[in-house]
């Protein structure tokens, strides 16, 4: 793989996947680390370890299977830790991470997760993905309210470029956005410090009570709200890779990195959609290059973990929101088409889409899981009724 021979839109897709992933949830991980009692240096080490783990796993799986397999930390898992780690010591938090990732490895080895994913109808997987991505599309247009000049210009340039050179539309929008942000003086780089920080080994402290109260919920949230949508997104995009090896590999890697602050590494859904879209590459079989580029950017982000928070603060939120929405627009449209074009499965797909898009959280598990469950129940019930009426 030669970077100089990779088309610019493919390079941009890989970069955007990492940028949006960090921009959307790095602050949540920072909060969780603070709650656990980590120092600033230890938090920087956590970000370094997470970046390296995601970079290694993304590159290894993508290059091995030649499909765009993007990994990511679990954002719902990080949100759970913000409350779940309260009252725990840092050593106990590391023990929770190790137990969680050991459970993920066990789940992958038994093949239970793979068997469950095989029975999910394609329309429901697409509906769930559309529901996950909907908020990014809505945020993009909502950002016009506060930053009309910036976001309106990005939208107009994207639309004009889309008409004549579709593959370069997102690049053009990004460039005009940067120009306007620089002209307005909205980039603040005072807090960006590019000093590589090595991860610090933290001795784990295991507790049966914490394993039940924190590790088990974190395991369930990671599998239901991260790995399940990630595998379903791959399926919806038309890619197939053996599920169990993906889960085992990411779980083992996270297990190795757990003492350094890696609480999970799962299969990405939202950011992976950028690398799996036609904008990344017109040839479906070449889109793995975008994921490989993302893996390289993950490694770079890991090497400069101390700069991540400062970099996120330097960019206007509206610029990131508009860019994310434009990058995911075709994926949202394609997912909706795949979800709704089969009339017999349409009602179940609509239920899955709406429940997922609602942001519903029950027992600490996010709406993506419940969207699949609700859509699946509708699918089974409606098919049983149709079968009974037929005979």
Model-assigned labels for residue ranges:
Residues 38-39, 113, 167, 239-240, ...:
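Short coil/loop linkers at secondary-structure junctions
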Residues 34, 118, 235, 258, ...:
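Short polybasic/polar patches that bind polyanions
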Residues 29-33, 57, 78-82, 138, ...:
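Predominant activation on well-ordered alpha-helical scaffold segments within soluble catalytic domains
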Residues 1-44, 171-244, 391:
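Helix-loop-helix hairpins and the membrane-proximal interhelical loops
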Residues 23-24, 149, 225, 267, ...:
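Residue-level signal for transmembrane alpha-helical positions in Major Facilitator Superfamily
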Residues 86-192, 293-391:
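Membrane-embedded alpha-helical modules
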Residues 2-4, 10-29, 48-129, 241-329:
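Helix-loop-helix junctions within the multi-pass membrane cores of secondary transporters/permeases
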């Amino acid at each position: 793989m030669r970077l100089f021979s990779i088309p610019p839109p493919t390079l941009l897709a890989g970069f955007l996947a990492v940028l949006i992933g960090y921009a959307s949830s790095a602050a949540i991980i920072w909060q969780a680390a603070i709650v656990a009692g980590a120092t600033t240096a230890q938090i920087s080490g956590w970000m370094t370890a997470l970046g390296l783990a995601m970079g290694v796993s993304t590159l290894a799986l993508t290059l091995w299977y030649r499909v765009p397999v993007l990994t990511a930390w679990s954002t719902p898992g990080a949100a759970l830790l913000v409350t779940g780690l309260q009252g725990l010591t840092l050593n106990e938090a590391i023990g929770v991470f190790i137990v969680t990732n050991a459970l993920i490895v066990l789940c992958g080895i038994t093949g239970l997760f793979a068997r469950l994913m095989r029975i999910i109808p394609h329309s429901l997987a697409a509906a769930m993905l559309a529901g996950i991505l909907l908020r990014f599309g809505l945020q993009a247009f909502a950002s016009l309210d506060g930053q009309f000049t910036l976001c309106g210009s990005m939208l107009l340039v994207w639309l004009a470029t889309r008409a004549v050179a579709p593959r370069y539309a997102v690049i053009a929008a990004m460039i005009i956005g940067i120009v306007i942000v620089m002209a307005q003086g909205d980039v603040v780089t005072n807090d960006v410090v590019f000093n590589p920080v090595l991860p610090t080994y933290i001795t784990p402290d295991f507790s049966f009570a914490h394993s039940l109260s924190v590790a088990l919920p974190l395991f369930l949230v990671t599998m239901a709200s991260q790995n399940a949508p990630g595998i379903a997104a791959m399926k919806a995009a038309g890619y197939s890779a053996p599920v169990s090896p993906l889960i085992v590999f990411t779980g083992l890697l996270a297990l190795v990195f757990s003492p350094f602050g890696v609480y999970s590494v799962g299969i990405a859904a939202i950011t992976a959609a950028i690398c799996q879209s036609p904008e990344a590459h017109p040839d479906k079989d070449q889109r793995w290059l975008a994921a490989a580029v993302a893996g390289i950017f993950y490694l770079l982000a890991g090497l400069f973990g101390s700069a991540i928070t400062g970099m996120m603060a330097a960019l206007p939120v509206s610029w990131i929101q508009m860019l994310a929405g434009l990058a995911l627009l075709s994926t949202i449209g394609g997912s909706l088409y795949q979800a709704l074009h089969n009339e017999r499965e349409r009602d179940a797909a609509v239920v899955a889409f709406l429940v997922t898009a609602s942001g519903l959280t029950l027992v600490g598990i996010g709406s993506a899981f419940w969207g699949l469950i609700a859509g699946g129940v509708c699918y089974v019930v409606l098919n049983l009724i149709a079968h009974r009426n037929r005979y």
